[in-house]
Structure formats: structure tokens, C-alpha cells
UniProtKB/Swiss-Prot annotation:
Catalyzes the N-acylation of UDP-3-O-acylglucosamine using 3-hydroxyacyl-ACP as the acyl donor. Is involved in the biosynthesis of lipid A, a phosphorylated glycolipid that anchors the lipopolysaccharide to the outer membrane of the cell. Keywords: Acyltransferase, Lipid A biosynthesis, Lipid biosynthesis, Lipid metabolism, Repeat, Transferase. This is UDP-3-O-acylglucosamine N-acyltransferase. GO terms for molecular function: N-acyltransferase activity; structural constituent of carboxysome shell. It comes from Prochlorococcus marinus (strain MIT 9312). The keyword Transmembrane helix does not apply. GO terms for biological process: lipid A biosynthetic process. It catalyses: a UDP-3-O-[(3R)-3-hydroxyacyl]-alpha-D-glucosamine + a (3R)-hydroxyacyl-[ACP] = a UDP-2-N,3-O-bis[(3R)-3-hydroxyacyl]-alpha-D-glucosamine + holo-[ACP] + H(+).
Length: 344
């Protein structure tokens, strides 16, 4: 695809196109990172990107960047064509979607699939090899359910969803529209509910369900448990990385993003647009407000107000954590001084 055609594509997109400088209208065949790009490839560079220092070593034919005079001047000196937008990352995502076409699965049901006679399958669905679909399950239109996945009984799936290989969707789960569940994830498994009695554990039956709204994406090897009663709920637009654990009865708001190894204990309530970095843990029944950001390995043991940026274990405001960390580094020196004072 000619670079000028990619410029036209970006103009029509959501990155807020500003201008372009094309030194040679080459055919763009591929995309790559800034330090790995070669001739006939396109890359991107954000204003705060740590790869700025590697710009003079890049062999990219074109670079998408922000309206930064320093970067634009450097690109001109290097004779690298550039496309200037407000949000380079979004523009690059749009280019990737165009250059790398998504694999489309042909509608149809594979001969090895096992589908209960009471299940209902909508139009234009792809049901892959060794898929199981249980009794009274209803699946909407244009869904791709790939190899080895199991959809148990009384499940409701909307339209335009992709369920990747070897996923399990347990009974009493609802999945709305335009969702993606990546491989080996389990939706609606039994919640971790046991009652202590006489030095033993009595199992609490987990008879609830899971409801996942539209445009949710779930990474690989995630587990979303169902509660004893009621539902575990994930609102629209939320994104889960790989290896995320959502406990029974958890309620998660809209457009949240949870990185790998986040764990949320049963009954917690997470607001809208919450960002949890890697390995954040949320205690049971804790309420986390809207627009909260929690840094990596943060331990959230109490309710968090809207808009807070928190860090540490136990979680505290980020500024307090930074001060505490600074003091923590000095503890050996302070302890030594205290011992010296004790001897006086």
C-alpha cells in the first residue's frame, strides 16, 4: 500500500490528523517497532517515547509521530517521511488493522462439534472442531467459537463475539455483544466459598451466574468465578490482561483495564475507568471508586475514593508511598545511628 494511501486512511481515523511530510511515496508493506523497522516499513514515535534517542538509527520508511518540533525537525534532517497526529498510538493501531487482515472463519458447524438438541445457534456462526454446546444455550449471530471450547447449559451469548480455543463458559453465564475471550480462560467457574466448621470446611454451593456486557476483552488463562447467589458482573468496555482472577460476586464498572496477575477477592466493587497494574490485589468486599489508578503489586485492603492514585502494601496515596519508600531505603543507616545513640 502506498504511503499516501495510508495517510488518507489515517485522515479518516480517530487519531486527529494534523499534517504529513512525504519525501518518497514508497509502498508500505509492513509495520515494526522504531528500532527494528527497515525499508518499506512504518513505525511510530510518541513524544515521551524512550526510543527518541534511537531515531537517528531507524531505517523506517515512514514514522507516525506527534506535533513535536524537535522530532519533526530530526525526521526532516534524516529524510524520513512522517505523519503527524495528536495520538500516534491510535494511528499506528489503525494502520496495523489495515496491513494485517484479521482471519475470518467461515460460517458453519464442524462435524466433530457436539451440540445439544435444545441449543439454538444463530446465523453466520463458526463452531469449530471439538466444540461442545450444552442444553438450552442460546447463541446469537456471527459468533466464532473456536477449537475445543465448551459452552455449558443455560448460557446466553449475543452477537459478534470471539471465543478462542479451549475456553470454558459455565452454566448461567451471559455474554453480550462484541466480546473477545482468549484461549484457556474460564468464565463462571465455582466461587471459592467454604465455611469453617469443627476444623473442617463445609462447601457453600455456588449457584449464581456471570454477566459480561458488550466490548469486554478477556486475556488468556483468566478465571471469572460465579457466586453462591446473584451474579459476578463486568460492565462494558473493560479489558483484562492474561492471568487475571475475578472472585465470586465481584462487580466491575465500565472501561476498566487490569494488567496481568491482578486478583480481586469476592464481593469487591470496582468503579468505572479503574486501572490496576500488574499483581494488584483487592480485598473482599472493598469498594474502589471511579478513575482510580493502582500501581504494580498494590494491596488494596480498604475502600478507595474516586480519582485516587495509590501505591504500596497496604495501599496509600502515591505521594505518601514514595516518601515512605525513600525512608525505607535509609532504615539500615537510621538503625545504625540509633544503636550508636543507645551506647552513649
Amino acid at each position: 500500500m502506498l504511503l499516501s494511501d495510508l495517510v488518507d486512511l489515517i485522515k479518516k481515523g480517530n487519531s486527529n490528523f494534523i499534517s504529513s511530510n512525504i519525501f518518497e511515496d514508497l509502498n508500505i508493506e509492513d509495520a515494526a517497532s522504531l528500532d527494528e523497522a527497515v525499508n518499506h516499513q512504518i513505525s511510530f514515535l510518541e513524544e515521551n517515547n524512550i526510543l527518541k534517542e534511537k531515531l537517528d538509527k531507524s531505517n523506517a520508511s515512514a514514522i507516525i509521530t506527534s506535533n513535536n518540533n524537535e522530532i519533526i525537525s530530526a525526521l526532516k534532517k534524516l529524510n524520513i517521511s512522517n505523519i503527524i497526529v495528536k495520538n500516534p498510538r491510535i494511528a499506528f493501531a489503525e494502520v496495523l488493522n489495515h496491513l494485517y487482515k484479521t482471519i475470518n472463519f467461515n460460517p458453519g458447524i464442524h462435524a466433530s462439534a457436539v451440540i445439544d438438541k435444545t441449543a439454538i445457534i444463530g446465523a453466520d456462526c463458526h463452531i469449530g472442531p471439538n466444540v461442545y454446546i450444552g442444553e438450552n444455550t442460546v447463541i446469537g449471530n456471527n459468533n466464532d467459537i473456536l477449537t475445543g471450547s465448551s459452552i455449558l447449559g443455560n448460557v446466553r451469548i449475543g452477537d459478534n463475539n470471539i471465543i478462542h480455543p479451549n475456553c470454558v463458559v459455565y452454566e448461567n453465564t451471559t455474554l453480550k455483544n462484541n466480546c473477545v475471550i482468549n484461549s484457556n480462560s474460564v468464565i463462571g467457574s465455582e466461587g471459592f466459598g467454604f465455611i469453617p466448621k469443627d476444623d473442617k470446611w463445609v462447601k457453600m454451593p455456588q449457584k449464581g451466574g456471570v454477566k459480561i456486557m458488550s466490548f469486554v476483552e478477556i486475556g488468556t488463562n483468566c478465571c471469572i468465578d460465579r457466586p453462591a447467589v446473584g451474579i459476578t458482573f463486568i460492565d462494558e468496555g473493560t479489558k483484562l490482561d492474561n492471568l487475571v482472577q475475578i472472585g465470586h460476586g465481584v462487580k466491575i464498572g465500565k472501561n476498566c483495564a487490569f494488567a496481568a496477575q491482578v486478583g480481586i477477592a469476592g464481593g469487591a466493587k470496582i468503579g468505572d475507568r479503574v486501572i490496576l497494574a500488574g499483581q494488584v490485589g483487592v480485598n473482599n468486599r472493598v469498594k474502589v471508586g471511579n478513575n482510580v489508578i493502582a500501581s504494580s503489586k498494590c494491596g488494596i485492603h480498604c475502600d478507595i475514593e474516586d480519582g485516587k492514585v495509590i501505591s504500596g502494601f497496604p495501599a496509600m496515596e502515591n505521594k505518601s508511598w514514595l516518601r515512605s519508600s525513600s525512608i525505607f531505603k535509609k532504615l539500615p543507616e537510621l538503625a545504625k545511628k540509633l544503636r550508636q545513640l543507645d551506647k552513649q
